[in-house]
Amino acid sequence: RNRKLEKVTSNAGNMGFEKALDDEMAKNIYVQNQYNSSHEFYDNNFLRIMLQKSDDEALKPIHYMFIHLDMMDRYYSRQEIFHFMRKIRSRLHQNEIMGEVKKGFFVILLYRLDEQQAKDRADEIYRYCIRKSENAYRSIRYDLIDVGVKKPVDVYDAYTRKQEEV
């Protein structure tokens, strides 16, 4: 975790240079470099730290795609769940980051997409999840949340708190 945090904070010094580039690819690379999204899953604590740093205008708009796996009455090991989620992660774009909220509950952060693009992308990811699940889970559902003008970490905390109450 400390190594991840050091990477995020060390990349913060490069933000001025990368934000100055007007090219769309450079902006997506900025998101990927900022959070090193292609390498691993993030846990809930690191996601919160990352979201606290997501107030940057270069990252907006931000949408959250929360994915819930209904595991029925069967026990799935973390390895089985992560094997499935790695398939999903391999399909993510440079401006998308995936993390685990808790077992069977994941989030994909969709940076720099307008509302319609985010809906289309979430539907595409959802269809891919259904295809790759091979009927292992009774249901896979998702919620798409637009952060809007609120603080990204506040929206994340409110949603996850609400899910714990259900």
Model regions and ranges:
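Active-site-proximal structural segments of metal-dependent nucleotidyl cyclase/transferase enzymes
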Residues: 46-76
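Catalytic cores and conserved motifs of cyclic dinucleotide signaling enzymes
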Residues: 76-83, 116-120, 147-166
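Alpha-helical scaffold within the catalytic cores of cyclic-nucleotide enzymes
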Residues: 51, 84-89, 119-134
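Flexible, glycine/charge-rich interdomain/linker segments that couple
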Residues: 2-11, 26, 38, 139-153, ...
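Conserved helix-loop-beta segment at the catalytic/binding core of cyclic-nucleotide signaling proteins
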Residues: 55-57, 85-115, 135
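Active-site loop/short helix in cyclic nucleotide turnover domains
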Residues: 28-36, 66-80, 92
